[in-house]
Amino acid sequence: MLRGQEERKYSIRKYSIGVVSVLAATMFVVSSHEAQASEKTPTSNAAAQKETLNQPGEQGNAITSHQMQSGKQLDDMHKENGKSGTVTEGKDTLQSSKHQSTQNSKTIRTQNDNQVKQDSERQGSKQSHQNNATNNTERQNDQVQNTHHAERNGSQSTTSQSNDVDKSQPSIPAQKVLPNHDKAAPTSTTPPSNDKTAPKSTKAQDATTDKHPNQQDTHQPAHQIIDAKQDDTVRQSEQKPQVGDLSKHIDGQNSPEKPTDKNTDNKQLIKDALQAPKTRSTTNAAADAKKVRPLKANQVQPLNKYPVVFVHGFLGLVGDNAPALYPNYWGGNKFKVIEELRKQGYNVHQASVSAFGSNYDRAVELYYYIKGGRVDYGAAHAAKYGHERYGKTYKGIMPNWEPGKKVHLVGHSMGGQTIRLMEEFLRNGNKEEIAYHKAHGGEISPLFTGGHNNMVASITTLATPHNGSQAADKFGNTEAVRKIMFALNRFMGNKYSNIDLGLTQWGFKQLPNESYIDYIKRVSKSKIWTSDDNAAYDLTLDGSAKLNNMTSMNPNITYTTYTGVSSHTGPLGYENPDLGTFFLMDTTSRIIGHDAREEWRKNDGVVPVISSLHPSNQPFINVTNDEPATRRGIWQVKPIIQGWDHVDFIGVDFLDFKRKGAELANFYTGIINDLLRVEATESKGTQLKAS
């Protein structure tokens, strides 16, 4: 009987040892399969990895449960057979099984520790790509879930086949997993990166992924066993931007906009505006795109074919004729128009004409500023109004100015009227001067003889009172204001002053040997105090109407106007100046805004909108800012610029922080663009005629 019991105990021990061996072999096969899977395919997105991090814990717990049950069974057998001499063999086998199980467990932990460390490093570099791969992530999540189910089924089938596995097979050591270089394709809502160092294999890999959306990936991430501390480490690495973060290569598009009040930001905006593509095409801007580049040392030819001459308005002083504290007329300190355009390679000039003189005198001075020579106001004109016939001498910016050699003329405020009158004299002459010359003989200026067509390519006016301004009628041309203006000219005409306000032809300049008292007495007898030959009168409604009747449209010239408005309608229907309008124009804005005619009320502080659009007796057409303004023989009226007062066009309001230098840069480069299109249109027409 004792022998039968020992045989049964031996059979039980043998059976238990077999069960333990089978379980150990099963664990070895599973761990080997997991190690191989982790070597083949690292994780590709955050969502799939999160699911992977959760599932290995469940499988690890299942393995640990099997180990605990096996150990418990073996302990029970030890207690039951502790006194038997044959237990030694069972203990040896048990220790071998435990050692192998422990070794397999260490292998699993080693593999997963390495995997967690590598995944943590990889997560940071792939964070921005993961954010851009939402669609791919959802598809891959489905694939991961299907694969996990397949793996569980495979593990169960492996258990039934584990009896054929060699028990002496050594466990495979953990191997280093190479970093994953797969990149997720950016979605349509993410701007493309300008980084030239991005991997070139991205498109090929994305194409492979998108080619078979329903095909399961056989290289799924390995199961991992991590604790809470390791999981926190992974999440922290996901939140920190890494070197490969795309957001660092998009020039701050994801960052809030920086204020542009600082000079550095404003200068950068101006630089960007100046470096925008310039076009010379009439209909297809893209075909004739042209980038603005500064003139090189050996570059003589400017970007524009015809010189651009900017003509200032009433009270304007430019260049050496401007006092020390007088602001830069063209652009102020916001954007120095002449200087910046010259840096970009354009041939531009700022004319210096009378600040207080009439449009007639200013037009004559403008001609000699371009052509060069001593100013000749005309014998008939000098005799009629009672001032000197000759004025100062100009060097000239274009001594060979003649028909066929053209200029572009851009005038601000009264400057727009001045250039219109000069072009009229060039083309049709001055009838009074021609008649006086026939009657009295002598010399006559070429400006007054007429017949000088094709010398002006375009005329552009900025906030010009083509039809006059009520501010001049009710304020500027009043006797009190005129006396103040002429008194200022009288004072600045002293022998120690180098500032010329433009009334020297009226005697407003102290002679070298003349005392100041004698100078005052002489000037007080000048006819200017009662004359209409001055700016104050020419800016009135009546003075502007006379100019409109004197001038005509040239069918060969491109005409363009720009207009601003800086007033709003009050509760009583009148126009009041907007907040931010230049403070010196508050009174004039209210004078215009309370005009009896409603259509004359809206204004830019000095000029009514209706007056700036175009001369009332000449044809016009409304154009957009995008279409090429190249029509000739008709006024092309640009859209009204909301919020721009009279001096915003030239940027001299240093108290207006809303108007930036970049805004002026865009405005004037837009004008230059139109002038280049005019030249391109003319060249195209010449080629067609030649063919």
Swiss-Prot record:
One of its GO terms (molecular function) is triacylglycerol lipase activity. One of its GO terms (biological process) is lipid catabolic process. Ca(2+) binds at G580, D645, D648, D653, D656. SUPFAM superfamilies: alpha/beta-Hydrolases (SSF53474). The lineage of its organism: Bacteria, Bacillati, Bacillota, Bacilli, Bacillales. Residues 1-37 form the signal peptide. This is Lipase 2. It comes from Staphylococcus aureus (strain N315). Residues 34-72, 83-115, 125-172, 186-207 have a biased composition (Polar residues). Belongs to the AB hydrolase superfamily. Lipase family. The keyword Hydrolase applies.
